[in-house]
């Protein structure tokens, strides 16, 4: 097991990474001394892991659960309200603990409900997908979607702990594994060229959920994100770099209808578009672009998702929260292993969209 600290101003929590951790959940949350526990999960995860989680937690405090019909299309205020209703029904108080057992959607909804219930109660993330383990469970971003865009309603609410049991990833469909690898590739691209090269070499083993390959990769991705979050918790500067590929990716998700493409699939395509943008701005060369596209393709992710109207895509991206005053600000690559924020000329963006198959 590897412990990755997340050091914030005046406080710290730990990401525990390793196989077999789910059965230690109760032992690890006991130090939080909750008056009661509510586990929020989805139907798929409930069938696989809920009984084990509850069995581990029951000796610690009265434990109840709520099964949320979680999907990206249903990640909205109504879903968060259902979790709040479940907390009320469970007679939760300000010393209660909410446990988010599931993928990124469950974590986002449950974390947001924890942030708003009684002005904030503690919660613990137990991510069950690769994407959630390496990215969405770390850093305290919680929220839900709005018709106008992804994650427009939310709050920063840090978990008390993250427990990333890598053995849970063996139950993932291949498509979900690939989706998580998009964030792994992203971390190497924006922060660590050596890690990016390591991921390139490990890709076949990662796709097979090889334990010896997965553990170090999950821990390294968590450490990269934890370092950025520790330096910029509220995204006033450096943390925005973690959005590499996401302005494009969020637009793809919104235009195609939430759920048509997994978040990681849209981000994988977004990474390629961001790399193309970087090449057109003479920040990276064509060899770097080809290498990035090959890494995304080798993760079995789409390099291009064509067919969208350019005007609609641009309008969608202008509404993204990484746009300021209507100006288009993107995270670009200065080289593999280093990202930066840049204002992008409209002509360059248009050329990238044309190259990506937009009409």
Residue ranges, per PLM feature:
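Glycine-rich beta-strand-to-loop/alpha-helix junction loops that act as flexible
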Residues: 70-71, 101-103, 244-245
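Active-site segments that bind and position negatively charged phosphate/pyrophosphate groups
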Residues: 197-311
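ATP/NTP phosphate-donor binding region
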Residues: 1-97
């Amino acid at each position: 097991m590897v412990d990755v600290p997340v050091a914030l101003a005046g406080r710290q929590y730990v990401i525990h990474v390793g196989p077999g951790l789910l059965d230690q959940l109760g032992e690890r949350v006991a130090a939080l001394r909750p008056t009661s526990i509510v586990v929020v999960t989805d139907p798929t995860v409930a069938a696989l892991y809920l009984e084990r989680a509850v069995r581990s937690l029951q000796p610690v405090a009265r434990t109840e659960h709520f099964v949320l019909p979680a999907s990206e299309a249903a990640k909205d205020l109504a879903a968060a309200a259902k979790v709040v209703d479940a907390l009320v029904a469970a007679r939760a108080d300000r010393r209660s603990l909410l446990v988010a057992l599931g993928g990124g959607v469950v974590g986002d909804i449950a974390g947001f409900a924890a942030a708003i219930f009684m002005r904030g109660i503690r919660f613990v993330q137990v991510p069950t997908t690769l994407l959630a383990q390496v990215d969405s469970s770390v850093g305290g971003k919680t929220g839900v979607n709005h018709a106008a865009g992804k994650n427009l309603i939310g709050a920063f609410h840090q978990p008390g702990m993250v427990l990333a049991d890598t053995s849970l990833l063996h139950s993932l469909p291949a498509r979900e594994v690939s989706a998580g690898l998009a964030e792994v590739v992203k971390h190497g691209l924006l922060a660590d060229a050596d890690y990016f090269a390591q991921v390139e070499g490990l890709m076949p083993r990662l796709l097979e959920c090889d334990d010896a390959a997965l553990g170090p990769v999950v821990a390294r991705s968590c450490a990269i994100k934890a370092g950025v979050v520790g330096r910029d918790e509220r995204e006033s500067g450096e943390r925005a770099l973690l959005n590499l590929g996401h302005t494009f990716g969020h637009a793809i998700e919104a235009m195609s209808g939430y759920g048509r493409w997994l978040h990681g699939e849209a981000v994988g395509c977004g990474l390629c578009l961001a790399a193309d943008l970087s090449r057109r701005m003479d920040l990276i060369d064509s060899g770097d672009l080809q290498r990035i596209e090959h890494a995304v393709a080798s993760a079995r992710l789409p390099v291009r998702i064509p067919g969208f109207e350019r005007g609609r895509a641009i309008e969608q991206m202008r509404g993204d929260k990484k746009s300021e005053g209507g100006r288009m600000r993107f995270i670009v690559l200065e080289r593999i292993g280093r990202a930066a924020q840049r204002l992008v000329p409209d002509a360059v963006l248009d050329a990238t969209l044309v190259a990506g198959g937009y009409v």
